[in-house]
Amino acid sequence: MPAFESFRDAASYVAVLAHESAHWTAHPNRVGRDLSRYSKDRTERAREELVAEISAALVCADLNITPELEPRPDHTAYIQTWLSVLSNDRRAIFQAAAHAQRAVNYLHSLQPQADAGEK
């Protein structure tokens, strides 16, 4: 993760942290998404990036924040690859959303539970 100071605001930092945390959940001891082809197959990379982006959106919605991320040069390429995956597989968005929800559920499970009196 880049330093906190390199982000426009706290919401933008949280959005990127949520995205990267979603990738972290893929490990077999967490939610277990198969990333073995991530570095070799652009389609598989696009699928995982969709999962991470949807996860970040869900986390931001849970926290009631709306980040304003700085555009990056690679965003266009990311979106083009996502569009290719989505147009070639009509189930892809549902699969990505399901994986994202599992990732977010796992991240939520790591949070300490509030006492009944704290709610």
Language-model-detected regions and their locations in the chain:
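Alpha-helical transmembrane segments and their helix-helix packing motifs
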Residues: 28, 32-34
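Hydrophobic (often cysteine-bearing) scaffold residues that line and stabilize catalytic clefts
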Residues: 14, 48-51, 96
